[in-house]
């Protein structure tokens, strides 16, 4: 089985923010970046194409010729919960952040996820694909 993983293009938010599952805008360079991705995918035929439902992924999938890519919640970016769109500096003053910064792999953000939570949901999705009869798939997601 061949799995093509495609990361979304650059987002248009200041550096240093936990944006996770927030549907943030894309940079004005979207078309140039997307054109490079489209060129790399040209000539490939996929048995199935999925996309994270976040616009930064669905827009790229559509640009590359897959406007009907199946939206899959399990491949969303990690959820920072209450910390979505907060700066890392701002988070460092939150008393709950110490436990998270010390063990973000296992400790979830408030009302959000740990890295292990994200890994578990994404791996369940990927295992389903592996167990299918599909030979060549493409997934538009996050990095």
Model-derived features with residue positions:
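Generic hydrophobic alpha-helical segments
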Residues: 37, 41, 118-129
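Absolute protein N-terminus
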Residues: 1-2
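Active-site-proximal alpha-helix that buttresses catalytic centers in soluble enzyme cores
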Residues: 6-67
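Histidine-centered catalytic micro-motifs
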Residues: 5-9, 140-143
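Active-site-adjacent alpha-helix immediately C-terminal to a catalytic or transition-state-stabilizing loop
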Residues: 58, 66, 123-143
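Phosphate-handling substructures
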Residues: 64-123
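A glycine-biased structural micro-motif
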Residues: 43, 85, 134-135
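Short beta-strand scaffold positions
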Residues: 51-52, 120, 140-141
